[in-house]
C-alpha cells in the first residue's frame, strides 16, 4: 500500500516525500476500515487520481494555466495531446486502482481492523496534525477550476465596455500595422537570438529592429496573452477586460482585424477569443469545416492579402499563428526538417526548430507581399512579431521534448522583431522589456495617445524597463531548473 500511495502522489504532481506518503496512507487506512467510506470516499478519490495520473506524471498538479488551456483547446489539440503521452503512462491508473482493491481485499479477508488499535490511531492523529495534507491535489484542482470558471462567466455574461475613452493619433507613420503572434517559440531557439542552426534567415538578416530581452506575461497562451493584450493589474498579475488592445486601437478610429489559426469560437469565450471578438473583422481557420484539421499557418496569407487589397483605410491586423504549439512535429508535416538528426533523442528538437523556421518563412512571405503592395500602391506598413511564451525541456522515453511540463528559467524569454516599409538598416537592442507593459509598447508603435497609456514607453529605445513586477522573484521561487537551448548540430 505504501508504494500505491507513493505512485498516487507522484502521478498527481505532488512531492512524494515520506511524510506526504504516510499522510495519504493514514487517510486510506482509516477510511478503508469502513465499507461505506471506502466506496464513497476512497474509491472516488483514487479514481480521480488515477484518471489524472498519465498527465500528472509529466505536467504536475493542475493549476490556472493548465485548466484555462483545457477550456481553450479544441478536439484536434486534445487528440494530439493524448497521442503524445507515453503508452506506459496509461498503465498507472491500472496500478493505482489495483493497489487499492488488493489492499481492501487483504484486510477484509484477514479481518484486520486497524481502527480498534487505539495506540495506532493516536500515532496517526499526531502525525497528521503536523500540517501538510494529501488533499492538496484536490484543493489545487478545485481552486484552479473555480478561478477559470469565474473568469469565463465574467467573459460571457458582461458586455465588456471599453474604459479607454477617446484616443488620438500622433506620429502614426504607417497605413497598415500588422501584429504577428507566434506560438510557444522560445527566444534561445531562434538563430536571430543566438541559436547555432540558422532557422531564422529572415529575422537574422532583414532590416528592422530586433529586441533581445522581452519577457512573456505567463507560461502558456491564455495566462500570457490575457495580460499582454490588456492593461493589467501589475501588482496582482490580473487582466482588465475593460482595457483591451483591440478596444484601444478602435478608440483611435483604426479598423481592426483578427486572423487566427488558434481555434474557433465555442460555447465559452476564452480570454483570448473574448478579446478577438471585439475586432471589426474576425477570421478563424479552425472553425466549421476546419474543426478537425491540422491547418497550416500559411493558409492565413491569402486572407491577409485579401484584406490589404480590399481597402486603403488605416488598419490594425492581428495574426495569431499555430507556430510551434506543443507536438511540434505535427506543425511541420507539410514542411522540411531543417537538420539531419540521426539520434532519436534529438528528433523532437529538430521538429521544434523547424517549426520556428516555418514561422520565419511565414514572416518573410508576408513581408515580401507587403513590400510589393507598398511599391505598387504606396500602402506603407509596419510588421511586429513576438511569441506568447516559451517552453521547457522534458525527456520521455529517451526523447527530449519541449512542453509546459515544468517551468524553466528560460520559459518567459520570447522574441521581438519589427520591420517596416521604410526600414533601411538593422538594429539590435539588448534591453529587458516586461510583457506586462506590452500594451504601452503597442500604443507607442502605432502612435496612439491615451491618458491611460505611458506615452514615454517604447519597445525600441534599448533601455531596460525599471520594473519586472516580481517576475524574477516568481521564477526563483518556482524553479531552479536551468535548461538552455540544445544544439543538435551533428547529433
Predicted regions and their residues:
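Long, structured stretches of catalytic cores involved in phosphate-ester chemistry, encompassing
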Residues: 363-365, 387, 433
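Membrane-interface soluble catalytic domains
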Residues: 1, 9-17, 32-40, 50, ...
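Short beta-strand segments
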Residues: 258-260, 316-323, 353-359, 382-387, ...
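Short glycine/proline-rich turn/loop motifs
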Residues: 227, 340-348, 420-424
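Transmembrane and membrane-interface helices of multi-pass
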Residues: 1-141
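Histidine-centered active-site microenvironments of extracellular/periplasmic hydrolases
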Residues: 194-198, 377-421
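Active-site-proximal alpha/beta segments of enzymes that process anionic O-linked groups
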Residues: 134-339, 413, 435-467, 472-475, ...
Amino acid at each position: 500500500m505504501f508504494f500505491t500511495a507513493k505512485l498516487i502522489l507522484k502521478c498527481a504532481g505532488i512531492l512524494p516525500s515520506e511524510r506526504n506518503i504516510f499522510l495519504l496512507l493514514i487517510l486510506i487506512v482509516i477510511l478503508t476500515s469502513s465499507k461505506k467510506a471506502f466506496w464513497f470516499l476512497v474509491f472516488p478519490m483514487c479514481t480521480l487520481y488515477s484518471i489524472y495520473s498519465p498527465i500528472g506524471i509529466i505536467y504536475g498538479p493542475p493549476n490556472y494555466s493548465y485548466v484555462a488551456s483545457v477550456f481553450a483547446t479544441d478536439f484536434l489539440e486534445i487528440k494530439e495531446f493524448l497521442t503524445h503521452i507515453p503508452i506506459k503512462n496509461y498503465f498507472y491508473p491500472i496500478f493505482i486502482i489495483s493497489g487499492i482493491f488488493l489492499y481492501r481485499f487483504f484486510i477484509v479477508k484477514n479481518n484486520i481492523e486497524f481502527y480498534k488499535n487505539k495506540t495506532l490511531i493516536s500515532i496517526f492523529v499526531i502525525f497528521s496534525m503536523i500540517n501538510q495534507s494529501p488533499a492538496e491535489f484536490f484543493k489545487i484542482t478545485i481552486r484552479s477550476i473555480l478561478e477559470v470558471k469565474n473568469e469565463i462567466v465574467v467573459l460571457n455574461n458582461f458586455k465588456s465596455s471599453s474604459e479607454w475613452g477617446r484616443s488620438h493619433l500622433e506620429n502614426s507613420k504607417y497605413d497598415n500595422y500588422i501584429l504577428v503572434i507566434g506560438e510557444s517559440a522560445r527566444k534561445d531557439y531562434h538563430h536571430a537570438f543566438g541559436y547555432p542552426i540558422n532557422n531564422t534567415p529572415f529575422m537574422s538578416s532583414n532590416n528592422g529592429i530586433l529586441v533581445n530581452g522581452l519577457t512573456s506575461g505567463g507560461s502558456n497562451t491564455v495566462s500570457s496573452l490575457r495580460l499582454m493584450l490588456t492593461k493589467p493589474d501589475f501588482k496582482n498579475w490580473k487582466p482588465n477586460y475593460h482595457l483591451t488592445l483591440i478596444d484601444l486601437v478602435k478608440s483611435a478610429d483604426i479598423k481592426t482585424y483578427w486572423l487566427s489559426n488558434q481555434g474557433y469560437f465555442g460555447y465559452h469565450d476564452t480570454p483570448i477569443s473574448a478579446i478577438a471578438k471585439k475586432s471589426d473583422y474576425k477570421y478563424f481557420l479552425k472553425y466549421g469545416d476546419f474543426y478537425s484539421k491540422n491547418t497550416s499557418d500559411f493558409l492565413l496569407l491569402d486572407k491577409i492579402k485579401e484584406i490589404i487589397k480590399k481597402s486603403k483605410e488605416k488598419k490594425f491586423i492581428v495574426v495569431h499563428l499555430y507556430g510551434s504549439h506543443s507536438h511540434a512535429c505535427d506543425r511541420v508535416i507539410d514542411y522540411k526538417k531543417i537538420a539531419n538528426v540521426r539520434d532519436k533523442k534529438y528528433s523532437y528538437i529538430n521538429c521544434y526548430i523547424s517549426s520556428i523556421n516555418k514561422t520565419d518563412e511565414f514572416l518573410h512571405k508576408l513581408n515580401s507581399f507587403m513590400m510589393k503592395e507598398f511599391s505598387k500602391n504606396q500602402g506603407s506598413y509596419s510588421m511586429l512579431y513576438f511569441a506568447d511564451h516559451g517552453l521547457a525541456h522534458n525527456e520521455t522515453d529517451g526523447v527530449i521534448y519541449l512542453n509546459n511540463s515544468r517551468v524553466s528559467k528560460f520559459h518567459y524569454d520570447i522574441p521581438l522583431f519589427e520591420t517596416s516599409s521604410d526600414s533601411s538598416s538593422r538594429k539590435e537592442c539588448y534591453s529587458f522589456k516586461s510583457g506586462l507593459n506590452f500594451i504601452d509598447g503597442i500604443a507607442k508603435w502605432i502612435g496612439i495617445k491615451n491618458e491611460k497609456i505611458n506615452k514615454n514607453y517604447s519597445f525600441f529605445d534599448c533601455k531596460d524597463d525599471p520594473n519586472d513586477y516580481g517576475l524574477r522573484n516568481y521564477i526563483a521561487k518556482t524553479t531552479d531548473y536551468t535548461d538552455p537551448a540544445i544544439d543538435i548540430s551533428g547529433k
